[in-house]
Amino acid sequence: DGALDHFADVPCPSGSGPRHMEFNEAVDRLYCICELSGEVLVYDVPTFSLLQRIQADEVNAGGSADVHLHPSGQYLYTSHRLDNDGISIFKTLADGTLEKIGYARTGRHPRNFMITPDGKLLLVACMNDNLVQVFRIEADGALTLTPSVLRFENDRPSCLTL
């Protein structure tokens, strides 16, 4: 009938500012990027008990924005804006917790990004630069900026989706 039923509450630390979440079905984990604290919260599913708090925003700018899991499930990426704009890179461990393995600088104000279904590219909407940057995802999860770029005249791209 299209109705939604309440399943559970996901407890988030006070002042963290939960923004977006991503499921990892392979290991029954939920990842939450927190805009204000700059953390990724890792939860067990279906209990929603908090397993890990790991810092993603390197400078505590209070502008963490988006989170996406690589199609392989091996890497998690988060975007950060307002200062030291970029993408944090995490390796997903066997138990679904995270290990931070890198950071890739982007254009200004990367509010949103997407990973192509084949897992080869990561596209970032750099709102304050009026462009979309294209990164190649390497075998080790690292990001390499490609020469490909989409430029816009005063359109301030803020969301990408397929």
State each model region's role.
Residues L121-R156:
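Internal helix-turn-beta structural module
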Residues A65, L69-H109:
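C-terminal structural cap/anchor segments
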Residues N24, C32-L36, T78-L82, V124-M127:
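Conserved beta-strand positions in repeat-built beta-propeller and related beta-rich domains
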Residues C12-R29, D57-G73, A104-L121, L150-L162:
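Beta-rich, blade/repeat-based domains predominating
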Residues D5-C12, S49-E58, E99-R105, T146-R151:
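A short beta-strand motif characteristic of beta-propeller blades
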Residues G38-V40, N84-I87, N130-V132:
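Structural signal for beta-propeller blades
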Residues I33-V45, L50-S79:
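Oxyanion-binding "anion nests"
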Residues D1-A3, Y43-S49, I89-T97, F135-A142:
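Short loop/turn segments immediately following beta-strands, especially the blade-tip
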